[in-house]
UniProtKB/Swiss-Prot annotation:
<feature type="binding site" description="covalent">
    <location>
        <position position="61"/>
    </location>
    <ligand>
        <name>phycourobilin</name>
    </ligand>
</feature>
<keyword id="KW-0605">Phycobilisome</keyword>
<keyword id="KW-0472">Membrane</keyword>
<keyword id="KW-0042">Antenna complex</keyword>
<comment type="function">
    <text>Light-harvesting photosynthetic bile pigment-protein from the phycobiliprotein complex.</text>
</comment>
<feature type="binding site" description="covalent">
    <location>
        <position position="50"/>
    </location>
    <ligand>
        <name>phycourobilin</name>
    </ligand>
</feature>
<dbReference type="GO" id="GO:0009535">
    <property type="term" value="C:chloroplast thylakoid membrane"/>
</dbReference>
<feature type="binding site" description="covalent">
    <location>
        <position position="82"/>
    </location>
    <ligand>
        <name>(2R,3E)-phycoerythrobilin 1</name>
    </ligand>
</feature>
<keyword id="KW-0157">Chromophore</keyword>
<feature type="binding site" description="covalent">
    <location>
        <position position="158"/>
    </location>
    <ligand>
        <name>(2R,3E)-phycoerythrobilin 2</name>
    </ligand>
</feature>
<keyword id="KW-0150">Chloroplast</keyword>
<keyword id="KW-0089">Bile pigment</keyword>
<protein>
    <recommendedName>
        <fullName>R-phycoerythrin beta chain</fullName>
    </recommendedName>
</protein>
<keyword id="KW-0793">Thylakoid</keyword>
<dbReference type="InterPro" id="IPR012128">
    <property type="entry name" value="Phycobilisome_asu/bsu"/>
</dbReference>
<keyword id="KW-0488">Methylation</keyword>
<dbReference type="InterPro" id="IPR009050">
    <property type="entry name" value="Globin-like_sf"/>
</dbReference>
Length: 177
């Protein structure tokens, strides 16, 4: 995983050049948006339990067979595993948002996730739906449009960060399906 600063250094080093020009401008822009990025990550992590539990509840409401005997969320142990997986996925989405780079999500979370779910018999369509619900909630918290909870956030438009987190959730959904 390379953050924005490390990427610039690695690229400049590969060219045997000093950091300058467009690379410095990109870093200045990254720093200027830093408070918004931190607030966006905080909005997700402060509401992570709510985001994940709502996503799993929504997934189950749409597919009640998941909690019937033989369903993948039947028994407390399986439900706990489902909630745990949702927390892990959302945590790595927040790491990617903080770094401004999806590689931590790809390398440490998504690599092999579909194969693991298939081996365990986890219904991928339900998992994708839960990720979709998490995506909508995370975007709502970042843009401060969540109906039940408003947060103090940095001034300015956070739509780019909302789009960024949405793209990370889309990566998760694509990796699972």
């Amino acid at each position: 995983m390379l953050d924005a600063f490390s990427r610039v250094v690695v690229n400049s080093d590969a060219k045997a050049a000093y950091v300058g020009g467009s690379d410095l401008q990109a870093l200045k822009k990254f720093i200027a948006g830093g408070n918004k990025r931190l607030d966006s990550v905080n909005a997700i992590v402060s509401n992570a339990s709510c985001i994940v539990s709502d996503a799993v509840s929504g997934m189950i409401c749409e597919n009640p067979g998941l909690i019937a005997p033989g369903g993948n969320c039947y028994t407390n142990r399986r439900m706990a595993a489902c909630l745990r997986d949702g927390e892990i996925i959302l945590r790595y989405v927040s790491y990617a948002l903080l770094a401004g780079d999806p590689s931590v999500l790809e390398d440490r979370c998504l690599n092999g996730l579909k194969e693991t779910y298939i081996a365990l018999g986890v219904p991928t369509n339900s998992s994708v739906r839960a990720v979709s619900i998490m995506k909508a909630a995370a975007v709502a918290f970042i843009t401060n449009t969540a109906s039940q909870r408003k947060m103090a956030t940095a001034d300015g438009d956070c739509s780019a960060l909302a789009s960024e987190v949405a793209s990370y959730c889309d990566r998760v959904a694509a990796a699972i399906s």
